[in-house]
């Protein structure tokens, strides 16, 4: 695998968890638990504060730090003390956010992620829905012109925006992207919420 090849070649692995981290997949980080990757560097943002305060960061493995410390190169250093880093309010928000996540929110996301994915796949019976894909509490519904041949809709139709407008009127916000509808529901979602989301999506797509 890529992971084993990287380890054998002493190549460092960097994992981007800006979207997948902090609960979206039911774990603080999805790299090891979901994707079976043990990275040397993880970049993260967004979910670390649940969006209540702008904050991003990096996590670095002990292996990488050890290699930096043992280097004889004159310029070997880990420069992490920057002018706008370690904002006290941002860090306080992140710490409290993680405390809340570890109080049942991660478990809820882990339990309901598969339910969310399964319910969304019921939309595949609609003529223009060509694909429903995702993992955990993040998903994408892709619309096509011909389900059988999976021909994409004309990009200038921006069908995702059309569906989003209908869904907004019914109480659901999507992220439209050309012919796709992207969803990242709250981590505190319940089964009734999932049913309502799928019902509104169905109505929005039909309209």
Each model region followed by its residue ranges:
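Single conserved hydrophobic/aromatic residue that forms the stacking wall/gate
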Residues: 1-8, 12
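Conserved PLP phosphate-binding loop immediately N-terminal to the Schiff-base lysine helix
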Residues: 13-34, 47
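Buried hydrophobic positions in well-ordered alpha/beta secondary-structure cores of metabolic enzymes
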Residues: 16, 42, 56-57, 87, ...
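Active-site PLP attachment segment
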Residues: 33, 37-67, 86-93
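Amphipathic alpha-helix from the class-I
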Residues: 63, 89-107, 119-121, 125, ...
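A short glycine-threonine-serine/GTX helix/turn-capping micro-motif
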Residues: 76-87
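PLP-dependent enzyme catalytic core of the Aspartate aminotransferase-like
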Residues: 101, 111, 179, 185-207
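Conserved PLP-binding catalytic core of the aspartate aminotransferase-like
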Residues: 110-117, 126-166, 187-190
